[in-house]
Amino acid sequence: MAKGKDVRIRVILECISCVRKGANEESTGISRYSTQKNRHNTPGQLEFKKFCRYCRKHTTHHEIKK
């Protein structure tokens, strides 16, 4: 039987370059990736280098709050 909340949760990673660019200029969109993380192993926020199709390069993607 499972105890308490689920250990694995779904998180959304968002490109920080698109978010910053969107405030200053007109942006075509914001790159987002969906993934899972284990709360016990990674209690902090996730940060990955992933490909952003709007920036057309590999950029840092941070976990966003729901």
Swiss-Prot record:
<dbReference type="GO" id="GO:0009507">
    <property type="term" value="C:chloroplast"/>
</dbReference>
<dbReference type="InterPro" id="IPR001705">
    <property type="entry name" value="Ribosomal_bL33"/>
</dbReference>
<comment type="similarity">
    <text>Belongs to the bacterial ribosomal protein bL33 family.</text>
</comment>
<keyword id="KW-0934">Plastid</keyword>
<dbReference type="InterPro" id="IPR018264">
    <property type="entry name" value="Ribosomal_bL33_CS"/>
</dbReference>
<dbReference type="GO" id="GO:0003735">
    <property type="term" value="F:structural constituent of ribosome"/>
</dbReference>
<keyword id="KW-0687">Ribonucleoprotein</keyword>
<dbReference type="GO" id="GO:1990904">
    <property type="term" value="C:ribonucleoprotein complex"/>
</dbReference>
<protein>
    <recommendedName>
        <fullName>Large ribosomal subunit protein bL33c</fullName>
    </recommendedName>
</protein>
<keyword id="KW-0689">Ribosomal protein</keyword>
<dbReference type="GO" id="GO:0006412">
    <property type="term" value="P:translation"/>
</dbReference>
<dbReference type="Pfam" id="PF00471">
    <property type="entry name" value="Ribosomal_L33"/>
</dbReference>
<dbReference type="InterPro" id="IPR011332">
    <property type="entry name" value="Ribosomal_zn-bd"/>
</dbReference>
<dbReference type="GO" id="GO:0005840">
    <property type="term" value="C:ribosome"/>
</dbReference>
<keyword id="KW-0150">Chloroplast</keyword>
<dbReference type="InterPro" id="IPR038584">
    <property type="entry name" value="Ribosomal_bL33_sf"/>
</dbReference>
